[in-house]
C-alpha cells in the first residue's frame, strides 16, 4: 500500500448525496480480478453519453482543469449500495488518494482503509467551502495532523489511530501480519506434528 502523509492537490467537487457503488463503477465493468483498469469507467453513466458513449463534456471528470486532482469532495452516504470492492479500486485507479464526504457506508469505508484510499468525514459547511475552490487551487490534506487546510481555513478530522498508522506507514493487513513473522514462526515450531 502506498504511504499517505500529506496530499497537496486540487479537488473535484461532486456534491451529490447517496452516490452508490453502482454509480461509482457499474456492474458490467466488474469482470477483472485485478485492481487496475477500472478508472476509465469510473462514474461511467455520468461521464459518458448514453447514446453515443462519447465523453460528456458537462461532467466534471471530463473537464481538463480537473484532470490532475487527487481529492474528491462529495456528499452524504458515499459508497452506499452493494459491497463491491471494485468501487474503491476504480477511484484509486483513476488517481484519487482522498475522498472527503459527509458520511460513508460502513463497507465502503472499510474497503477504502484496506485499499489505501483515505476516506475523510467533514460536515457539509466545510465540504461546501472545499467544493467551491477554483480548479487551479490546491488544498492540503495533512494526515499526521488530521487536518484539511486551504488558505485561512483549517478543518480537523478524526481517524482511527490504527488506520492512521497503516496509511502513514503504507501498511496493509498482510504487511502488518508480517511484522509478527518471527513470533508466528516460533509458534509454528511449538505445534506438535500430528503426522
Swiss-Prot record:
Keyword Glycoprotein attributed: no
SUPFAM superfamilies: LeuD/IlvD-like (SSF52016)
Family named by the database record: Belongs to the LeuD family. LeuD type 1 subfamily.
The protein's name: 3-isopropylmalate dehydratase small subunit
Subunit structure: Heterodimer of LeuC and LeuD.
One Pfam family, short name: Aconitase_C
Pathways per UniProt: Amino-acid biosynthesis; L-leucine biosynthesis; L-leucine from 3-methyl-2-oxobutanoate: step 2/4
